[in-house]
């Protein structure tokens, strides 16, 4: 009689659930046990087939010999019983014993398959729990990242609005400076024209004064023109006063012109500074716009709902246990 004892260790369910982080090792262990059970079943089938072949061949031979021997003895003495005739009953008992052993082996095999199914379901539950926790952690982290990105986006938007407001103010200041500069330029042009007219008038008065002085010299040489000389002297004095006053006005206008030119130079320098500030603000606004677009893209990607699947254990057993708990099946077999 051949006896095959199958021993396998099934990890406790509570330990597998507590060590869900080692689900990869559990899956490998389940697959290894599955392959081991398959090998055992194949071996048992081969043993059973071989045992039946040997027993049938041996029983057939013994049966023929016993039948022939019993026939010969029966002719000699019908009342006497040959002990070899009882070998058939013994053989039948052996066959029944083998059948019982095979039945026990099959039952053990079924128990192993049920335990394997229970272990596989426990591993699948552990995998689902781990996947669920990972998914929840991912959702939490994604929400935190999305919130940070939203805060950064709002902060960038506020900074952008502030920069745009400053840029607008600087542009207005620049326009005002440009208007003042244009006014100063017009004022300078008017002052230059006024000074030119005054210079021309001054030259005219000087020429008239010189002409009167020459005429006065000519009249002084003659004593008969005393009254005319006095009139000429009076006119020359008036011209001199006009020339002096005109010279004072021209000097004042030159000072005003220099002052306006200096103001214009200051406005030009201010205009250059405003241009630089506006250019810097435009660069900052462009940078903020680029960062804002990038954050919008990141927020859009983060807000998309990820599609996740919870992994399930793959069935590697031929045992059909749909709708029935493995533990209930194990209890039924033990009864």
Swiss-Prot record:
InterPro entries: Tuftelin_GRINL1A/MYZAP/CCD68. Residues 101-305 form a coiled coil. Expressed in bone marrow, colon, small intestine, spleen, testis, trachea and cutaneous T-cell lymphoma (CTCL). One of its GO terms (cellular component) is cytoplasm. The keyword Coiled coil applies. It is found in: Cytoplasm, Cytoskeleton, Microtubule organizing center, Centrosome, Centriole. Keywords: Coiled coil, Cytoplasm, Cytoskeleton. The keyword Zinc does not apply. GO terms for biological process: microtubule anchoring at centrosome; protein localization. Interacts with CEP170. Centriolar protein required for centriole subdistal appendage assembly and microtubule anchoring in interphase cells. Together with CCDC120, cooperate with subdistal appendage components ODF2, NIN and CEP170 for hierarchical subdistal appendage assembly. This is Coiled-coil domain-containing protein 68. The gene is CCDC68.
